Each structure stands twice: as structure tokens, then as C-alpha cells.
Curated annotation (Swiss-Prot):
Keywords: ATP-binding, Glutamine amidotransferase, GMP biosynthesis, Ligase, Nucleotide-binding, Purine biosynthesis. Residues 206-398 form the GMPS ATP-PPase domain. The lineage of its organism: Bacteria, Pseudomonadati, Pseudomonadota, Gammaproteobacteria, Pasteurellales. The gene is guaA. It comes from Mannheimia succiniciproducens (strain KCTC 0769BP / MBEL55E). This is GMP synthase [glutamine-hydrolyzing]. Residues 8-205 form the Glutamine amidotransferase type-1 domain. The keyword Protein transport does not apply.
Amino acid sequence: MNNIHNHKILILDFGSQYTQLIARRVREIGVYCELWAWDVTEQQIREFNPTGIILSGGPESTTEDNSPRAPEYVFNAGVPVLGICYGMQTMAMQLGGLTEPSSHREFGYASVSLENSTALFAQLNDDLNSSLPKLDVWMSHGDKVTRLPEGFQLTGTTSTCPIAAMSDESRHFYGVQFHPEVTHTKSGLALLTNFVVNICGCTTNWTPENIIEDAVARIKAQVGDDEVILGLSGGVDSSVTALLLHRAIGKNLHCVFVDNGLLRLNEGDQVMEMFGDKFGLNIIRVNAEDRFLDALKGIDEPESKRKMIGKVFVDVFDEESHKQTSVKWLAQGTIYPDVIESAASKTGKAHVIKSHHNVGGLPDYMKLGLVEPLRELFKDEVRKIGLALGLPAEMLNRHPFPGPGLGVRVLGEIKKEYCDLLRKADAIFIEELYNSGWYYKVSQAFTVFLPVKSVGVMGDGRKYDWVVSLRAVETIDFMTAHWAHLPYDLLGKISNRIINEVDGISRVVYDVSGKPPATIEWE
């Protein structure tokens, strides 16, 4: 079996918004890497035993007294080091160079002229018409290096940044002021490949097939002949977790699918057909619609609804798990970004974005071991694993669906009537997006039920029925988003179908709010 962790890159995070992108690019190259806060100890680095180290960018200034520094051991570990943006600046300062604040922040595209020979830029040139090789890059920095450390040579320069890249070929230390991890830097992936593969000497074993083989072996080693329980929702993470576990332990996996009555049209049947009939998993369906709706009666505040849905789910799942008396382990679909977001730096310098529901252990009363086979994987890697395991692409690439389901897409109090109307309207919206080729052009699309009535005319009669809003957005990271400019004729067709086919809806509106100021979901 290939050892997928034999060669590995350590990425130290100084707080850049692009840091996770560095890790995803290294994984894309085919090499395992981990992302740690910058203030790790020498002992932790020694134990991880990296083949190479990358220092990320960050928002701080190296000219300030308390700014983050790389552990000194990074430069004494005997492995190649690449500093990106702030990472280059702290490398320069810590090794005897000088950095100063720029007269202006440089943000956007730039052309770097390459000087002197360096292994980092081998075979790279984005301007074949120039006498000197050049790279089209993305800059985002305030400070700049003004004096090279001893042993370093200048390898790149721009009109506003005289030292845009530097290298010490004997120690294999490299610095770039730009961001090779973003797609705006044309040869960024090739540059990172030069560092990870050619300079660090990593073998590219990190592939879906090898990851599956490794995950199955680790599950077998962890749980042996014990039985495992998993809450299967039909989402990407729990679905891939289920198939990995099934491949490893077969019928010793018990899947519990809690149908809360807040799912999309026919979704419960589709989950059972997919995992029960097609893949042959040991799966129990718990029809808990009445229980959820009863618990939600009279609750109209969004956060209170979320908490109640979460509480009822835990109660239902706990009851089912107690019926499985021989179960010793609980499986969860925790993925790597969940782990990163929940890891607090020991100095408090690295900010915790949020505490994720999948990280931080189990309720005290659940005396089960924890199995997390996706814990090392990014979402795009989970999808690739799912594809290799036989999950259909349309399921793996489906738009995000919130954990509370329709509970946050029915505004105000949740009633069965509202959910049924919303399910039908949303199914028409999604079907028409598929048929028109727009589904994969937008990042997320859904329908929202508004608890207001509007007058309509059907034939010779007057009707007074409910209103729904269509929402479609385009985004890269879901942190900001633009509303999607769907064609008017498509919106008209969707509206006509919903009003004519869904008895109880008299008006359809389209949400043209961006994020910010609006959030993507209404609640």
C-alpha cells in the first residue's frame, strides 16, 4: 500500500485569507499537507517531520514589535522553506534582512521580471515576447523587503516592489512577495509544483484511490470487529463517510436516516433508494416529521428554530443509538476545514472562526468512540473520493442545503402546509434551472416561503394565497455573493409554472440582494 503521509508539507498560518488555498493547491499537486498556527513549538514540528515548510501571508506588519514570527527551528530543520508575502517578509527579517512599510499598499495584478536563476522559477515564463522571463502574479501587501538577508539573491522584481522574490539556493530557502496559491497568478500551480515536487522531493501519492485505501485500512485498524453508528443525512460528507465505512466494515455499520419533514421533495425516498437499494447499506429510516413539527409549533425566531431542530435531532438519534446495544463507535463526517476552524492557537493570536458542530467531542452521556474518516480532507477532495466510490456526480455537486433544511426557508413559524407548498415550488425552480443549463452556472439556488398572502386572479375567480421568493446567487467562497442575473424569460417560465401547478401560491418574486448586506439564506 502507498504511504500517503510519507512526504508531507507543513503550512504555517499567519492569518491570510488565502491560507487554505495554499493547502488545497499542495493537495491538488498530489502531496499531503497540514495547516498549523504559526506559533507551534519545535517539538511539534519535529514530531510532524515535514519534507518542506511553507510560511503563509498574513494581515500583520513585520515592522511591529509583537508581529508573528516563524519558530526559529523552521530555518534549522534542514528542509526547504517557501515564504509567501508576509511569510517572505518574516523570513527576510528573521535571517538578517530588512523590511519597511510601503508608501502604498499593492493590491492586484503585477508583472514580475525574473532575475538570476532559481529552482523555484524553473521553466516558468508568462511573457514569451519579453527579453527577460516574466510572471503575471497577484499582489496583496503593505510592507516590503528592502535588504536581502546574507546568502540570498534577488530573483524577481516589479516596478513598485524592487525585491519581489528572493532565494538562497544552498539552504533551499525561497521567498515570493506575491500569492502563487490564487488562480490570478498564472503560473502559480507550476511554481508550487517546483517547490513541493522538484525542490522538496515529494512523491505525489495523495490521490483519491490511495486516500480510499488508506482510510479503509485505518477504519479497520481503529474499530476492528466493533459496530459503528452513523447519522446519514444524504449530504456529501455523511454519504462519503457511509461508503468508506461500508467498504471497511460492511454490515457492522448501522446508518440512521432521520426524516425530519424539512427535506426537499422526495428526498427521503431518494436517500433510502440510493444507500439501501443501490449500495446495500444497513440503514434505518426514522420518520420523525410529526415530532419535529410539534416541537416547532409557535416558534418563529430563526435561531430558536435552529436550536430546536438540533435538539430534536439529537434526541431522536440518541434514542435510535440506544436500540443498537452492541454499537461501540459513532461516525461523523467531520472534514478538514471544520478542524482548522475549531483549532485555537495556544497564544490566542490565531483567531477561531467558529466552533463547528462536528468538532469538540460528544455529549457526555454518549459513551462511544469517535470515527472521523474525512478528518484530513477538504470539501473538493471529499467530492473526488465520493466519485471514486461510485456516488453520482449530480448528487456530489448539488447546491448546499442548510442543516435545519426547510426550517430556515419557511420564514416564521413552520407548518406542514407551508413545507409542502415550498417543496413543490422549489422542485419546479430547480428542475427549470437544470433544463435551461443554469443550475451549475449559479452557486446556490432555492425557494423561500413568505408567510404573507397576496391577491391573485385565476380564470374568472379571485384567489388570496401565499407568496414565495426565488433566490439564486453566484459566489466563490460564500463569504460574499452576487445575485444571479437569470434571464427574464426563464424567471417568467418558473413563475408561471409555480403559480399554475402549486395550488396555494399566488405570487412569485425574485430576490436581488447581494451579500453583503443580505445573507444568502433568509434566516
